[in-house]
Design a protein with these regions (language model features):
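Non-heme Fe(II) oxygenase metal-center motifs and adjacent flexible, charged/small-residue loops
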Residues: 1-138
C-alpha cells in the first residue's frame, strides 16, 4: 500500500470531497493509527463538529472505494463525545465515549454487522475534530 501523493476525489453521504496533500503532522498521526490497528492507511477524512448540535446519523462505512473489512481508525481531538453502535440484526446498542486524543478502531465485520453514529447533544459547547483513517482501493 502506498500513500497517494496526488489529490483525488472521494464521495460519501452524497458529497464529493477533493483530497489535500499529507502534512508531516498528519503522517505521524496516521502512523500511530497504523501501529495500533495493524492496517496500512492511504486516506484521512477530517470532520469538524463545531459543538454538540452537530452529529452524524446512523450509517456504516460501506463505500465501494474502501477496502472490504479493512480497519478504520478514528482519532478524536477536542470535546469528549458519546458514540453509539447499533447491531443491524439484534438492534443492540452500545455506547463508548471518545475522549480528546483517543483512537477508536473499527475492523473486521464491524461495518457489515453494525451501524454507528455521533448523536447530537446540547450539553457540548466546544468543538471536536475527528480524523478517520481509511484504506481506499485504487
Amino acid at each position: 500500500m502506498r500513500i497517494i501523493k496526488k489529490p483525488f476525489e472521494y464521495s460519501y453521504s452524497n458529497t464529493v470531497k477533493k483530497a489535500l496533500m499529507w502534512t508531516d503532522a498528519l503522517i505521524e498521526l496516521k502512523q500511530t493509527a497504523e501501529q495500533v490497528s495493524g492496517e496500512t492507511y492511504n486516506s484521512c477524512l477530517l470532520n469538524l463538529y463545531h459543538d454538540g448540535n452537530e452529529g452524524m446519523a446512523w450509517h456504516s462505512d460501506g463505500e465501494k472505494d474502501l477496502k472490504k473489512d479493512g480497519a478504520i481508525g478514528s482519532m478524536s481531538f477536542g470535546a469528549e463525545r458519546k458514540f453509539a453502535f447499533k447491531h443491524k440484526t439484534t438492534r443492540e446498542t452500545v455506547y463508548v465515549f471518545l475522549e480528546h486524543g483517543s483512537l477508536l478502531v473499527m475492523k473486521g465485520s464491524t461495518q457489515t454487522n453494525w451501524l454507528h453514529r455521533l448523536p447530537p447533544t446540547k450539553k457540548i459547547t466546544t468543538a471536536r475534530v475527528n480524523l478517520t483513517f481509511r484504506t481506499i482501493v485504487e
